[in-house]
């Protein structure tokens, strides 16, 4: 269904955003004039998301650290993160990322809402989106999940805002908040 009607579904959503904008302005013009951006991910059902997968790697790294007398500054969790693959074996669009306080394998997306909490845009950072925005980098680049998240979020912001403005020229936010 999604493959056949993805563009139609996107068009319906975009039209609803344009139709509901005047309603949002009538409810509260100040809140409607805010635009909030965040990225998140939808965890996929892949083997890499099974806690046993990560626990096995962490256990191996802890054993290695103990056998080699590594000091207390060694972080086995960061080492496990760095040693795990950047994407799931079953689907390369399912990327390793830091979502809601933990790392997992997920489909990454950006979401924009107004100050009323009404969703104005959802952009899935899938292959097609990334091909049309080569400046967005989703692959892990460091050994720290926190650093990777901040790098990926900052790279996604500008292209997502430009696409939003192109799709919804009547919406002119006065305040922008990004996480």
Question: What do these predicted regions represent?
Answer:
Residues 1-178:
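Polybasic low-complexity intrinsically disordered regions
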């Amino acid at each position: 269904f999604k493959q056949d009607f993805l563009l139609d579904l996107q068009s319906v959503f975009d039209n609803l955003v344009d139709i509901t904008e005047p309603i949002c302005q009538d409810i509260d013009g100040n809140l409607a004039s805010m635009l909030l951006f965040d990225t998140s991910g939808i965890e996929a059902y892949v083997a890499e998301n099974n806690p046993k997968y990560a626990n096995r790697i962490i256990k191996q790294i802890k054993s290695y650290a103990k056998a080699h007398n590594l000091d207390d500054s060694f972080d086995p969790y960061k080492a496990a993160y760095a040693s795990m693959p950047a994407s799931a074996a079953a689907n390369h669009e399912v990327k390793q990322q830091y979502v809601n306080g933990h790392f997992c394998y997920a489909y990454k997306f950006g979401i924009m809402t107004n100050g009323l909490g009404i969703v104005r845009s959802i952009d899935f950072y899938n292959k097609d989106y990334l091909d049309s925005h080569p400046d967005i980098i989703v692959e892990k680049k460091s050994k720290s999940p926190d650093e990777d998240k901040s790098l990926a979020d900052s790279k996604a912001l500008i292209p997502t805002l430009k696409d939003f403005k192109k799709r919804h020229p009547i919406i002119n936010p006065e305040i922008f908040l990004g996480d």
